Amino acid sequence: MSLSRRQFLAVGSAAAAAGLTGCGSRSSLGGKNELSMWTWVGSVNDDLIGQAEKAIPGHDGMKLSMTRIGSNYKTKVLTALAGKSLVPDIVAINDDVATYFPNADQFHDLNELGAKDLSKDFLAWKWKLGITPDDKMMAYPMDTGPTALFYRTDIFQKAGIDIDPAAVADLAPDWDTYIALAKKVKQAVPGSSITDNITSIFSYRMAQAPKRYMTEDGQYIGDQDHVREAFDLAVRVVKEGLSANAQNGSTDADAVVTNGRLVAFNAAVWWAQLGPKNAAPKTKGLWRVTAAPGGAGNRGGSFLAITKYCKNPEAAFAFISWLESSKNQAQAFLDPVLFPSTPASYTDPRLSAPDPFFGGQKIVDVFAESAKKYPGAYFSPYDSIVGTPLSNELVNVETAGKSPDQAWSDAQRQIGRELTRVGAI
């Protein structure tokens, strides 16, 4: 099951031609002295945007006009590109950046605007994710989502476990030792869980892997051992009684944090805010963070791209490179808690301060190590086509008692049908 680089580009060009033809003339949003930008809530620092709305740094004759799109963000971006009219100059793109690669001809190659000279300032794996199969720099790095192990010190103490972050990391360097540790915690504090649901274990294990579902030359590898290992690990955690069975989107999702059932969680840096700080503020001081079992990982992170309809590409690049400088990424970590893709930010005093919610621990140090050690992995335009059936079948295992082997087989059959339908295999 393979698709060559040349075939991929041919398919991408055909998709772009078929999906992005429109009767409108090419035009971008906003006045001639404005750069229009689309993004979503919580993706940028408001103070920095406020500065650019007065004047683009280095381009005093230009200013930013930003729109926060609510629901269906990606659909609205693709619809605007398809119409080739009233297209924003700059768009934010989520971690599914590879799904935009077939439409790369609708975006500027940022290397032609000077991006290549700045690559040394960024995490190499993050930089690579914005590069298309034909080596065009389509998307500029924003934040990342390095992973680590969150845990409740009060619960671990009841199980007689040394709560020092370094000690916990030594006790659970891999998933086998971590599960053994979790069983000890559950024995001391019945009802304790180390995941909200089965799919989180699968997703975060895959987030540690150096390869995912497709190779760069288009070969399907989502049925290989590394994926099955993550699948089986998720099943094992459930079978050991260590999942809270709080499915995504359910009312129980936050409740397991609030009521204290979720006593440890291998998660991305952004979970600190979405999880304990929001759902369990009374647990302030009880949480710590340490290196995750199984190694460094990453889940999440965004990008900025400049559309071909941009009225002033040079000013647009000056803006995005300023916005995502190490100094400004450090500011964006404070609000809205976006973890930088620029390693120089990690030693910024604004990031390295102790966090009272985590008992005064400097948690940025833990996530910085994860971000730097993460091996990186290739994300294909078809990752969601592969990942969704696998996750759905895992839910069937946890909620309906489906046989794991049958769930795996059914997922692979559906994946094969869907990849065939879209011409990927």
Give the label of every model feature segment.
Residues 179-183, 217-247:
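Glycine-centered hinge/linker elements that transmit conformational signals in sensory
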